[in-house]
Swiss-Prot record:
This is Protein ApaG. PROSITE patterns: APAG. The gene is apaG. Residues 1-125 form the ApaG domain. Pfam families: DUF525. InterPro entries: ApaG_domain (IPR007474), ApaG_sf (IPR036767), Uncharacterised_ApaG (IPR023065). One of its GO terms (biological process) is error-free translesion synthesis.
Length: 125
């Protein structure tokens, strides 16, 4: 039996007030993702899929190769961290998705990106 690679994904988001224009329904958020390889062999992140939902229920799907122009190889016990951004029409929303990855044998697998919130500070309780 082939062991499924153990990958941990953590995300932190912040509101970027200096780039946002609330009166024009433009709310900019930055998020930092940390992908940790908790397994015993190398893995490589090849692609991403995001489902972005604003507080009106409008959903946008984003998919593509790699992240921030890279397809990082993550060694056992190591992590890859990057920061990216999203623009919403509402001050509150969520993101979730998955990464398309391969293990050291070239076997494809998906790693879930848990849902996280995008919110301006006044809406966080």
């Amino acid at each position: 039996m082939i062991e499924q690679p153990r990958i941990c994904v953590q995300v932190q988001s912040i509101y970027v007030e200096t780039q946002s224009i609330p009166e024009e329904e433009r709310f900019v958020f930055a998020y930092t993702v940390t992908v940790r390889n908790l397994g015993r062999s190398n893995v490589q992140l090849l692609g991403r899929y995001w489902l972005i939902t604003n507080s009106n229920g409008r959903q946008t799907e984003v998919q593509g190769e790699g992240v921030i122009g890279e397809q990082p190889l993550i060694l056992p016990g190591n992590e890859f961290q990057y920061t990216s951004g999203a623009v919403l029409e509402t001050p509150l929303g969520t993101m979730e998705g998955h990464y398309e990855m391969i293990d050291h044998l070239g076997q494809a697998f998906r790693t879930v990106i848990p849902v996280f919130r995008l919110a301006i500070p006044a809406l966080i309780h």
